[in-house]
Regions:
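Short beta-strand/loop motif that positions the catalytic acidic residue
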Residues: 223, 229-231
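Conserved HGGG/HGGXW glycine-rich cap/lid loop of the alpha/beta-hydrolase fold
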Residues: 20-70
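Conserved alpha/beta-hydrolase catalytic His-Asp/Glu region
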Residues: 22, 156-219
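Alpha/beta-hydrolase fold catalytic core
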Residues: 1-34, 56-58, 96-97, 278-283
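Flexible "cap/lid" loop of the alpha/beta hydrolase fold
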Residues: 116, 124-156
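Catalytic active-site module of serine/aspartate enzymes centered on a nucleophile-bearing elbow/loop
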Residues: 253-283
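Acidic catalytic loop of the alpha/beta-hydrolase fold
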Residues: 234-238
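Active-site loop/oxyanion-hole signature of alpha/beta-hydrolase fold enzymes
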Residues: 17-18, 25, 48, 61-106, ...
Length: 283
């Protein structure tokens, strides 16, 4: 499993967005602007092996999405629509007129909703094992809609490998340093309440809510931006068939399936991912 730290984390920066204190990283001072959107219950640390490489040629922003990481945890819905509107406010606060959106999992779903709402703010799209392209999602995600299950979660280091195991193809090789990156996020007080709210806003026991994914699928043909679809062949969170759903609906796409990868190709195969994205951005 070729995960290895390639950089130290950039300094944490904060910006108030609609009264919500939001953590972000920014690297790079030339080229076009990129916004990196992590998945549900993730954080900007997920992009640690990509941001410095991308920033050699681009101005790159990554932020803890509302209710995630070290950003504030407001009350209310965490639907894709709400998160897309929050992204719009964040980009305005940081003077990002338009950008390429690179979204993994729920971040991909947010990118798709945002592109439908604000097409003039999106230059290109990179969808990485994206949510929002069908009902199917892992049972573990469906179970976080149940209070009794979420209340069992405890912020111990031992839980991190157990929770992330199904995300990776080479699950037995999760690096120890990755546990150290993630543990402070898991240990933040009040996380369980947010996990439940995030789950119930977007999922039920059958999978992704129809009112969440169906409008996205129905509007794919209207997305004219060049779109790079990247998927891990052995994704156990969101099945690879959703990559082909995206390809069938999008009029201007490039599809890349990563063999021997799971839900996070940018972590399991960072060098390949970085080369592919940089090539797509310059094409």
């Amino acid at each position: 499993m070729p995960i290895h730290p390639s950089t130290t984390p950039p300094p944490d920066l904060y910006v108030a967005v609609n009264g919500i204190n939001t953590r972000y990283w920014q690297m790079g001072d030339r080229g076009s602007k990129l916004v990196l959107l992590h998945g549900g219950n993730g954080s900007i640390e997920f992009w640690l092996y990509n941001i410095a490489v991308l920033a050699r040629h681009h101005q790159v922003y990554a932020f803890d999405m509302v209710g995630s990481g070290k950003s504030d945890y407001p009350d209310g819905s965490y639907s894709l629509g709400y998160q897309a509107e929050f992204l719009h406010s964040l980009m305005s606060a940081l003077a990002i007129d338009s950008a390429t959106l690179i979204g993994n999992s729920m971040g991909g779903g947010v990118a798709l909703v945002f592109t439908r709402l604000y097409p003039d703010r999106v230059d290109k799209l990179v969808l990485v094992d994206s949510m929002g392209l069908g009902r199917e999602i892992s049972m573990g995600i469906r179970l976080i809609t149940l209070p009794a299950i979420v209340n069992l979660l405890r912020p111990g280091r031992w839980m991190i490998p157990a929770m992330l195991k199904s995300n990776f193809y080479h699950s037995q090789q999760l690096p120890p340093e990755w546990i150290e990156f993630r543990y402070p996020i898991f240990a933040i007080p009040g996380r369980n309440k947010v996990i439940l709210r995030l789950g119930q806003s977007n999922f039920n026991l059958a999978g992704v809510r129809a009112e969440v994914y169906q409008p996205i699928v129905d509007s794919l043909a209207q997305i004219t931006q060049k779109t790079l679809i990247i998927w891990g062949e052995y994704d156990r969170i969101i099945p690879v068939k959703h990559a082909y759903t995206a390809a069938e609906g999008l009029p201007n796409y490039q599809l890349e399936i990563f063999p021997n990868c799971g839900h996070h190709p940018y972590l399991e195969c960072p060098a390949k991912f970085n080369r592919l994205v940089l090539g797509f951005l310059t094409a």
